[in-house]
UniProtKB/Swiss-Prot annotation:
This is Sulfurtransferase TusE. Part of a sulfur-relay system required for 2-thiolation of 5-methylaminomethyl-2-thiouridine (mnm(5)s(2)U) at tRNA wobble positions. Could accept sulfur from TusD. The active site is at 108 (cysteine persulfide intermediate). The lineage of its organism: Bacteria, Pseudomonadati, Pseudomonadota, Gammaproteobacteria, Enterobacterales. Interacts with the TusBCD complex. Interacts with MnmA. Keywords: Cytoplasm, Transferase, tRNA processing. One of its GO terms (biological process) is tRNA wobble position uridine thiolation. It is an enzyme of class 2 (transferase). PANTHER family: SULFURTRANSFERASE TUSE. GO terms for cellular component: cytoplasm. Its EC number is 2.8.1.-. Belongs to the DsrC/TusE family.
Length: 109
């Protein structure tokens, strides 16, 4: 559980929001700080992309799917594992979806 702006925000044991509707960009900053990440414009690009992906496909992308979808939209420079791991060192799919307020991707350990 997180306390944010005086409200209790329910999370699972790994810190993923139980209700993605409670997400906001200001809450994302707090979640990112808990992950040891200071959000740059590049981080926001991925976080927003992951949220859009979830809204379109009703699932959080696992790493392979994330890399492929990022490459299709932004090109090979940003759609590759090295770039994404530089931004999200504990796992791009796991950390980006957590910061985006989405459920943990199914294929993430």
């Amino acid at each position: 559980m997180l306390i944010f702006e005086g409200k209790e925000i329910e999370t699972d044991t790994e810190g993923y929001l139980k209700e993605s509707s409670q997400w906001s960009e200001s809450l994302a900053v707090v979640i990112a700080e808990n992950e040891g990440i200071s959000l740059s414009p590049e981080h926001w690009e991925v976080v927003r992309f992951v949220r859009d992906f979830y809204l379109e496909f009703n699932t959080s992308p696992a790493i392979r799917m994330l890399v492929k979808a990022m490459a299709n939209k932004f090109g090979e420079e940003k759609g590759n594992s090295r770039y994404l791991y530089r931004l999200f060192p504990k796992g791009p799919a796991k950390q980006a979806t957590k910061i985006a307020g989405l459920p943990k991707p199914v294929k993430c350990i």
